[in-house]
Structure formats: structure tokens, C-alpha cells
Amino acid sequence: MSSEIPPQVQNQLAQLQQVQQQAQALAMQKNQMESMKKESEMALEELEKLSDDAIVYRAVGDLQIQSNKDDTVAKLKERLETLSLRLQSITRQEERISKRFTQLQEQLKQAMGTQGQ
């Protein structure tokens, strides 16, 4: 019995590692998006407590720009919607990656089982 790993199994192992790295990258992106969404929700909550004629400032790059409450609320709601859509997309990608990972694991088990016989 040869201890050398067949090229097909090596290829499947490489694919499995790649899928695992993709899953880790997606998890990091998801955490970042969730954090950004939480911050935006908290900001919106605080904004809604202010009077309608309140002057607010919002960050634009390195600057703080004076704005009115309504414009800032609208921008935050738009940002929240965008973040929610991105999170949904990432969740779908995670599901696909998870299925692919399971599929590759099964293929590897079968390949290793037939190799050992």
C-alpha cells in the first residue's frame, strides 16, 4: 500500500482548505457588518430622541458636517437598509459555502475509504 496521496485527493483537500478560508472571510465580514448595523441603529435611536429642529453633525470622512435631523435620519435609514441587504447576501453565501464544505468532506471520506481498501 502506497502512502502517497493521490492527486484527486490532494485536489479535494486544497478545495476544502479554500472553502474553509472563504467561510472564515465571510464570518469576519458578517461580524463587521453586524457591528456597523448595531452602531447605526444606536445612532438612529438617539437621533429620534432629538427635537425636529435640532442641529446635528455627521461624519463625512475626516470632517464633521452640520446637518438637520431629517436628512441625517434618512441617510441612517438608507445605510441600515444597505447593511441589512449585505448581511442577507453574506448569510446566503455562508449557507452555500457550508453546503460545499460538507459536500467536499463527504467526497474526501469516500476517496479515503476507497484508497484504504
From Swiss-Prot:
It is found in: Cytoplasm. One of its GO terms (biological process) is chaperone-mediated protein complex assembly. CDD domains: Prefoldin_beta_GimC. The keyword Chaperone applies. GO terms for molecular function: protein-folding chaperone binding; unfolded protein binding. GO terms for cellular component: cytoplasm; prefoldin complex. Keywords: Chaperone, Cytoplasm. PANTHER family: PREFOLDIN SUBUNIT 6 (PTHR21431:SF0). Belongs to the prefoldin subunit beta family. Molecular chaperone capable of stabilizing a range of proteins. Seems to fulfill an ATP-independent, HSP70-like function in archaeal de novo protein folding. Heterohexamer of two alpha and four beta subunits. NCBIfam families: gimC_beta. This is Prefoldin subunit beta.
